[in-house]
Amino acid sequence: MWFFNINGNNFYFTFESLDHKPQFFFFFFLLKIICLVTVILCLHEISHAQNYYVSNQRASYKGTNVLSRMEDSVKKQFETQQLTWPPEALYIRSFKYDRQLEVWVKSNRKEPYKLFKTYKVCMQSGTMGPKRMEGDHQVPEGFYQINEFNPNSNYHLSLGLNYPNASDKILSDSIRPGNAIYIHGNCVSTGCIPISDIPMEEVYIIASSVKAKGVDFIPVHVFPVRYNVKKSFDYLNASIKNNQTLLEFNKNIREVFDYFEAKKQLPVILVNKKG
C-alpha cells in the first residue's frame, strides 16, 4: 500500500502485484504534469495580481496621467543611479528636527541598502519626543511600517503608518493614543510627515511598485534628529536633558540608527513588556 497526503486529503493506493507498476509510474508522471501546470498558473496569477495592483492604484488616482509620467521619471532616475527598477526592498527614514525624509532601496535582500533620494519635510509640528496621545500634535518617533496606500487622499497622496505600534500601545495613552499618521503630499501637518506633492508622487510610485512585487513589509523609521550631525544632536540634548524617560528612549532608538549607519542593513527589532 502506498500513502499520499495532498492538500490535507489522504489518498491510498494498493497494488496487488508487480504487474501494476506501470500504472503506478504513470500516476506519478501525471502528478508531475499537474504540479508543473499548477506552478505555472500560480506564477501567472501572481504576476497578474502585481500588475493589477499598480494599475488599480493609477486608476483610483484622480491624476492617472501624472502618476504614469512620474513613473517614467522615477525609472530614469533609478537608471541614472544604476539602481534596479522596481527595487526588491524599500526603507524610509525621517528626521524631525532636520526635516528630511530618506528613501533607501536594494535589488536583493542580501545586499546593503542604497540611498535613492533625500526629500525635504516641508512642515513640522510638535517637539522632540514620541507621540503619546491623541491631539498632542506630535510626530511619532520609532519604528513603523506602511499599512495603507491612499491614492485619493485630501493631501494629494498618502502612505499610512501603523501607529500605534507595539511599543506605542504600551507607552502611550491607553484610551486615546491617536491614529491616522501619514506620509503625504501638500504642506500642512498636525502630526504627520508632509513632503509636498511632487516628491510624494515619487515616493508613492516607488512604494506601490515594491508592494506590487508582493512585499508587505515596508519599514519606516522616524528619528528626532540625525544623531551624527552635531547641531542636531546638541539641539536634542538641550531639549531632553532633564527628561530621563526621553533620554532612555533615545538611547534605545539610536542603536538602530547606528546599526544602519554602519551596515546599511536593518536589525531585528523586538519590543519587551516595558515598551
Regions found by a protein language model. Name each.
Residues 3, 14, 24-32:
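Hydrophobic alpha-helical signal peptides and transmembrane signal-/tail-anchor segments
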Residues 16-19:
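Acidic, Ala/Val/Gly-enriched low-complexity intrinsically disordered segments
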Residues 32-42:
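Bacterial N-terminal signal peptides
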Residues 45-49:
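Sec/Tat signal peptide C-region and signal peptidase I cleavage site
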Residues 50-190, 198-218, 227-275:
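Cell wall/extracellular polymer interaction/catalysis modules
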Residues 195:
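A conserved hydrophobic position in a structured secondary element of the catalytic/binding core
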Residues 221-223:
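Short internal beta-strands
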